[in-house]
């Protein structure tokens, strides 16, 4: 039956840009990719997008620890993430970042519309403040006991056990994650999104029947407990977008993160020009379909805040949320010590992507159930299903076709009714892919694979090949087996992209959903090459060991300049503005009699001379070599009386000290007296 082509926009939750992709992440991206690939096979216009979630205090602090800018860190992490997803053949049309101009503009637009419509409220709140670090503590930098279910060691914004959201001030026995100190309360003006104003709309959306039953039930609990206004602002220091007309206030990461879906799509539209319209997908009355694949830990944000923000700013709401559970490994939470906290890149060093794609797909359903990656079962299932049932079907027939018939298939089907049984299954299997009942689809396909192999066993082409005068029978039997293999691989194409490429090369034809209605008759296939190799537990053992070694390496003491000389506590811009840095010309440099550490520098500031003592003698044993160089000095440092005279400032140098100290110099063109800005 011909389907009407639909316009579909699909997203995955945005990975946070401060860590590597691991097998927990990959469940969602594989699930979405399988669904997207099926939709494309059915002729729908699908735009599949994602981005890195690149804002927040965790990124700011980690960048400080690494001694790089947040922009540099998120740029490097984006490349790593995209490499990992490409390695697993996730077919994104666009991968972007929330730290983008598109996202800034859309965040400001949505905020301004919400404000104009009266949905932004200002009020002063008491906020947790780290007295040791001198900073307000973001939600994720406070931990304590959940005020709802009393689970310990929960973050300050939501509980990973019961899913509740709350204010950090509601935590029981809170502690600063940054310093371990007990936070104190400080007042600060914050901006709030008036979520309760959307309660009626959200309840109607929940009752529409579009959402998973488990999601709808959970939302009903939240409605019954009452919706609260949502704090959408954070105080400096913070890495993110500053709120318009509110100096020192920034959008909370969870405000601009989902807008990142729109930002990534806008970036894609700009790349493609007129071929894709942003408004066609995001306008209020859009007929395009919008689906978010997310984990169960972020349902609250996507089912309440996000649709309310869109409604309040005159954009369309999602068609549906597709929510999945967590990943466990060998029946337990992923563990670094056991080597089961496995990065995506580590997996790809030991196994191919199709193997994990198949295993996850075989276990997924439309329910929000956790998926266990049992590594022994993984090996057995991949070998039993992909190798023994599917690939073996091709290999045991292709040899005869290639050797005895020059690769040409029979002109008629040996068993048309059996072939019809296979093609008739397209409706059931297609519906399973469509409804995300992936495990059911795999079971249906493997049942067909069993039928196909039973047919070959019963026809025994290896026996027929030895019997004189039965060449036509041999060709018919093996051609039938290869045609059944083609149908199976067509059904598996959304799951196994790399195996599909090899199968298409052998079959000498593209695998399409509707194409299986016409079998390959009198068709020439290519010489058969091994399509897939068996895997074994030795590979699993090597994978686990490699993961353990990565953890050990990451836990090793950090060495280098930052470890030896950590970054000082954060200062305000006003503090920094007090320091007056100027370009200075070194007119003279000489040893200081009686000191084995100091040099006396005569500096020209462009009309004013300064005398400065600097402890750089060990690094510059020939002071005359410094004469004529430009350097940077602190020009407004109070004069300091020393045994050898008065020092009227300080020159800037880098390094640990002694011989390893390096005088800073400005770029060519800087003049004495120029202010460093």
UniProtKB/Swiss-Prot annotation:
ATP binds at residue 336. A motif ('HIGH' region) lies at residues 15-25. Its EC number is 6.1.1.10. Its main location: cytoplasm. Its cofactor is Zn(2+). Binds 1 zinc ion per subunit. The keyword RNA-binding applies. Zn(2+) binds at residues 146, 149, 159, 162. It holds the Pfam family tRNA-synt_1g. It comes from the Bacteria. GO terms for molecular function: ATP binding; metal ion binding; methionine-tRNA ligase activity; tRNA binding. Disulfide bonds: none annotated. One of its GO terms (biological process) is methionyl-tRNA aminoacylation. It is an enzyme of class 6 (ligase). The keyword DNA damage does not apply. GO terms for cellular component: cytosol. Gene3D superfamilies: HUPs (3.40.50.620), Isoleucyl-tRNA Synthetase, Domain 1 (1.10.730.10), Methionyl-tRNA synthetase, Zn-domain (2.20.28.20), Nucleic acid-binding proteins (2.40.50.140). It catalyses: tRNA(Met) + L-methionine + ATP = L-methionyl-tRNA(Met) + AMP + diphosphate. Residues 575-677 form the tRNA-binding domain. Is required not only for elongation of protein synthesis but also for the initiation of all mRNA translation through initiator tRNA(fMet) aminoacylation. This is Methionine--tRNA ligase. The lineage of its organism: Bacteria, Pseudomonadati, Pseudomonadota, Gammaproteobacteria, Enterobacterales. The gene is metG.
């Amino acid at each position: 039956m011909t389907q009407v082509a639909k316009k579909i926009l699909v997203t995955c939750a945005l990975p946070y840009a401060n860590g590597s992709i691991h097998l927990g992440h990959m469940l969602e991206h594989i699930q979405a990719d399988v669904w997207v690939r099926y939709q494309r096979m059915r002729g729908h216009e699908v735009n599949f997008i994602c981005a890195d979630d690149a804002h927040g205090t965790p990124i700011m602090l980690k960048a400080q620890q690494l001694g790089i800018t947040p922009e540099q860190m998120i740029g490097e992490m984006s490349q790593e993430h995209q490499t990992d997803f490409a390695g697993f053949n996730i077919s994104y049309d666009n991968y972007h970042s929330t730290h983008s101009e598109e996202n800034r503009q859309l965040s400001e637009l949505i905020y301004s519309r919400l404000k104009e419509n009266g949905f932004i409220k200002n009020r002063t709140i008491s906020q947790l403040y780290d007295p040791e670090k001198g900073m307000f503590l973001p939600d994720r930098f406070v931990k304590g006991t959940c005020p709802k279910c009393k689970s310990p060691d929960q973050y300050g914004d939501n509980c990973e056990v019961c899913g509740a959201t709350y204010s950090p001030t509601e935590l029981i026995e809170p502690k600063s994650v940054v310093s371990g100190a007990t936070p104190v309360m400080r007042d600060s003006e914050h901006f709030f999104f008036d979520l309760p104003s959307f309660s009626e709309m959200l309840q109607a959306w929940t009752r529409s029947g579009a959402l998973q039953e488990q999601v709808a039930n959970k939302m009903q609990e939240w409605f019954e407990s009452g919706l609260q206004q949502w704090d959408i602002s954070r105080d400096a220091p913070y890495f993110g977008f500053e709120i318009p007309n509110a100096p020192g206030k920034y959008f909370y990461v969870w405000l601009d993160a989902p807008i990142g879906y729109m930002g990534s799509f806008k970036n894609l539209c700009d790349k493609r020009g007129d071929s894709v319209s942003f408004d066609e997908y995001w306008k209020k009355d859009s007929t395009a379909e919008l689906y978010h694949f997310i984990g169960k830990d972020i349902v609250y944000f996507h089912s309440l805040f996000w649709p309310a923000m869109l409604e309040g700013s005159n954009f369309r709401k999602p068609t549906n949320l597709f929510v999945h559970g967590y990943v466990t490994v060998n029946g337990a939470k992923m563990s670094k010590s056991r080597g089961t906290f496995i990065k995506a890149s580590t997996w790809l060093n030991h196994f191919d992507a199709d193997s994990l794609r198949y295993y996850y797909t075989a276990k997924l359903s439309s329910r929000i159930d956790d998926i266990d990656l049992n590594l022994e079962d993984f090996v057995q299932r991949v070998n039993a299903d992909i190798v023994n049932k599917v690939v073996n079907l091709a290999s045991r027939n292709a040899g005869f076709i290639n050797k005895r018939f020059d690769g040409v298939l029979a002109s008629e089907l040996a068993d048309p009714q059996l072939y019809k049984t296979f093609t008739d299954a397209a409706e059931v299997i297609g519906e399973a892919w469509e409804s995300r009942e992936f495990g059911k689809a795999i079971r249906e396909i493997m049942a067909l694979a069993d039928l196909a192999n039973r047919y070959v066993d019963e026809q025994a082409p290896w026996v027929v090949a030895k019997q004189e005068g039965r060449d036509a029978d041999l060709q018919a039997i093996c051609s039938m087996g290869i045609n059944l293999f083609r149908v199976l691989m067509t059904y598996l194409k959304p799951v196994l992209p790399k195996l599909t490429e090899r199968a298409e090369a052998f079959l000498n034809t593209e695998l399409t959903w509707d194409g299986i209605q016409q079998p390959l008759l009198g068709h020439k296939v290519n010489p058969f090459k091994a399509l897939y190799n068996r895997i074994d537990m030795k590979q699993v053992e090597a994978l686990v060991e490699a993961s353990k070694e990565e953890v050990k390496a990451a836990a090793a003491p950090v060495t280098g300049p930052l470890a030896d000389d950590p970054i000082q506590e954060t200062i305000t811009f006003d503090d920094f503005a007090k320091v007056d840095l100027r370009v200075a010309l070194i007119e003279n440099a000489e040893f200081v009699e009686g000191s084995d550490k100091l040099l006396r520098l005569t500096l020209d500031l462009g009309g004013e001379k300064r005398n400065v003592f600097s402890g750089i003698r060990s690094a510059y044993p020939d002071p005359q070599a410094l004469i004529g160089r430009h350097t940077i000095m602190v020009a407004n440092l109070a004069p300091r009386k020393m045994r050898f005279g008065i020092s009227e400032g300080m020159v800037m140098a880098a390094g640990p000290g002694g011989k390893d100290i390096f005088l800073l110099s400005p770029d060519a063109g800087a003049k004495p007296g120029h202010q460093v800005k």
